[in-house]
Swiss-Prot record:
Lineage: Eukaryota, Viridiplantae, Streptophyta, Embryophyta, Tracheophyta
Underlying gene: GRXC11
Chain segments annotated as transmembrane: none
Organism: Oryza sativa subsp. japonica (Rice)
Gene3D superfamilies: Glutaredoxin (3.40.30.10)
InterPro entries attached to this UniProt entry: GlrX-like_pln_2, Glutaredoxin, Glutaredoxin_subgr, Thioredoxin-like_sf
Family annotation (SUPFAM superfamilies): Thioredoxin-like
Name of the featured protein: Putative glutaredoxin-C11
């Protein structure tokens, strides 16, 4: 499953793993859309392997136990895991998100 998540996370400059109906997922994808980022979005609750991918994302976010909070949204930029809602929003407020998106080729401005 780790290889599958890594492959999916590298398919575009920005990849977001979400669940439909998750308001924090919507907040992150809306922010990226407003920044004109064309992210690949994978809704885990609509994927037959979604539960296994969610466990892998939790492990990546919170360590080997996979415990510590929600696994979605999980945002990858340039193939690297950035984090969830709080990390992405904090980066945006500090002015760090746009430069990272530019360096990954997700923004051209």
């Amino acid at each position: 499953m780790a290889e599958m998540v890594a492959r999916l996370a590298s398919e575009r400059a920005v990849v977001v793993f979400t669940k439909s109906g998750c308001c924090m997922c919507t907040a992150v994808t809306t922010l990226l859309g407003e920044l004109a980022v064309s992210a690949a979005v994978h809704e885990l609750d609509r994927d037959p392997l979604g539960k296994e991918m969610e466990k892998e994302l939790a492990r990546r976010l919170y360590g080997s136990s996979g415990r510590g909070g929600p696994a979605v949204p999980a945002v990858f930029i340039g193939g690297s895991l950035v984090g969830g809602t709080s990390k992405v929003m904090a980066m945006h407020l500090k002015g760090e998100l746009v430069p990272l998106l530019k360096s990954a080729g997700a923004l051209w401005l």
